[in-house]
């Protein structure tokens, strides 16, 4: 009898700690929604979390891609927090607060996906949910870009928000990459519908 499925399961499970860190970092970033936001604390907490999660497990090729994109999410979350701190962001534009909430939800789903039993059906659900949330984020970005120059005469504040928004968009793209990489772990695996 082949041990391939259990081996793949073990390889999948080895990313649980990183996925959990992604979920925690996204929840910490959500602190930017508060008014006033403690941008210094948010940046410091995410930096510590990212430093503790720096190692990528040594796994098969498809799995290495998953490891890379999970760590990319952490890196992008860290950079977003650094931008918010650099520009002393204490109050987000409404659309960016919405995006930060979407990112928090993506992080929560990611942590749950890797904490759940090994099941390709749930991987497909996860992918669909992340892509749906990414569409919601894109809509928020479009609304922001359509109006934000009319909201303030403070060009430095606009520049800071633009830099932060660009990095938050990269966070969303990184979550999309995770969503696309997860199903590869289940290639050639029979699908078991949840009971």
Q: Predicted regions: what is each one?
A:
Residues 1-195:
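Cytosolic, long alpha-helical scaffolding segments
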């Amino acid at each position: 009898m082949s041990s391939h499925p259990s081996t793949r399961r073990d390889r999948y499970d080895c990313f649980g700690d990183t996925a959990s860190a992604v979920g925690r970092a996204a929840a910490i970033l959500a602190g930017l929604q508060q008014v006033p936001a403690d941008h210094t604390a948010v940046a410091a907490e995410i930096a510590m979390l990212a430093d503790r999660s720096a190692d990528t497990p040594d796994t098969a090729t498809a799995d290495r891609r998953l490891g890379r994109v999970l760590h990319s999410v952490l890196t992008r979350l860290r950079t977003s927090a650094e931008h918010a701190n650099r520009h002393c962001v204490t109050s987000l534009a409404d659309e960016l607060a919405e995006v930060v909430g979407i990112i928090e939800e993506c992080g929560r789903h990611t942590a749950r996906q890797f904490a759940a039993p090994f099941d390709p059906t749930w991987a497909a659900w996860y992918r669909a949910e992340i892509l749906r949330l990414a569409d919601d984020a894109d809509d928020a970005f479009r609304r922001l870009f359509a109006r934000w120059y009319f909201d303030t005469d403070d060009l430095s504040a606009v520049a800071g928000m633009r830099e932060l928004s660009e990095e938050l968009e990269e966070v969303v793209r990184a979550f999309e990459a995770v969503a696309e990489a997860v199903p590869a772990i289940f290639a050639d695996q029979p699908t078991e519908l949840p009971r």
